[in-house]
Structure formats: C-alpha cells, structure tokens
Amino acid sequence: YLRATFGNWNNLTSNLSKAIRKFLFDNEKKEYCKNLFGNPSDAFLSMITSKGIVNVLFEVAILRNKWKAHGGITSEVENNQRVLSLQKQLNELRKYIADAFDETTMLSPTTCSFEDGIFTFNAKQLIGARTPFNEITIKSLIPLDRKKLYLSNSQQTKPLELLPFIKFIEATDAIYFYTSIESKDVRWVSYHFDKEAELKQPADDDLFKAFEFLK
C-alpha cells in the first residue's frame, strides 16, 4: 500500500467485507464485532460489508483499466458514453449506501470540557462536499484526539477512531485522502479544495503502524 492502486484497495475491501460478514453471522462473535465498530446501526454494518458495493468498485476498476489501456484522443460521443457508464455505477453505489449514514457521522473534534465523567466535545461534522462543515456537540465517555478523525454513532458514547488514511486540514476546511508514499513524503489528494488539491507531507509513525495493521 506504499503505492496504493484502485485494485489493491478493492481487494482489501472485498477481503475485509467477507471476514466481517463471517463474524456477524457467528452468534458468538457478532456482538464482539459490532463493538469493534462502535455499535453502529444494522444498516451501517450492512452497507460497509455489502457485496453490492464491492461489485460496483470492481466494475469501475474494469472500466478505468479498459479506458486507460486504450488511451489517446476520444470523441465527444465516447466521452459522453463514459460519463453515462460512471453515472450508472454511481447510482448503484448510492442505492447500496441509502440511509446507512443517518445515525453515523465522521467528525473532527475541536474543543472539549469534562464533567461528571463525561467529555463534551465541539466537533466538525465531516459530511458532504460543501464547506465550511457544520459544528456539532457530542458526548463521549472517552477522550478524543483533535489530530484524529472518528466515526460517531448517535446512539453511542464511544466514537470509533479511524485509521490515518483520511486527513482533515482545518486551515482549508478540506478533507484529504491518502494515495501513496513517494520517497519520504506522503501524497494526499482532496476533492474539496481545488487551490491545493494535492499535498505532500512527511510520513509519520501512525501511518506506518496502520500499514503494519493491514498486513
């Protein structure tokens, strides 16, 4: 994953989804598995382990490789046809996601207070393509690191820390995604901030620990 490819991520997604489904179908392991994900809704677990989503991702990878292999100048008709093909896959993806995120959100904690054993955090709610992101207040039984991102379920009080493949840059109010390591720097890309759509930053220990975790 030092030079991540679409195919590698798809294979990882497929393998993890299959493993999680096995845990969820095992009555002795189901609750343990749900707890690892912060006890989200059944709709959320169903979505992230969906065979349908994996199939869509593999289909898009096939299209991408096909178009890349036959590179060169393409006609407007061909370009329009490609857009229609991708829109079809996007609609399929939306169908599988549906309302799975209604009770689960990704957040970036900011300020905090502590009283009677409960942390009260202000946090950026990282939803959608429009910025600036909304600020919300959440209750938590555990401390949250403002340098990290979390998944928070509205019915739970222990947000789930995400692996550091997604980064929120507060100064630009933009989300960046890990793409590769080049020399000693990490390359990040954003779909929010066109003025600086790519970043290169020194790799840190947390990222390498995440790589070890995925082996």
Language-model features: where?
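Accessible peptide chain termini
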Residues: 1-2, 215
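Polyanionic, low-complexity intrinsically disordered segments
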Residues: 46-215
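Flexible secondary-structure boundary motifs
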Residues: 2-63, 92, 185, 196
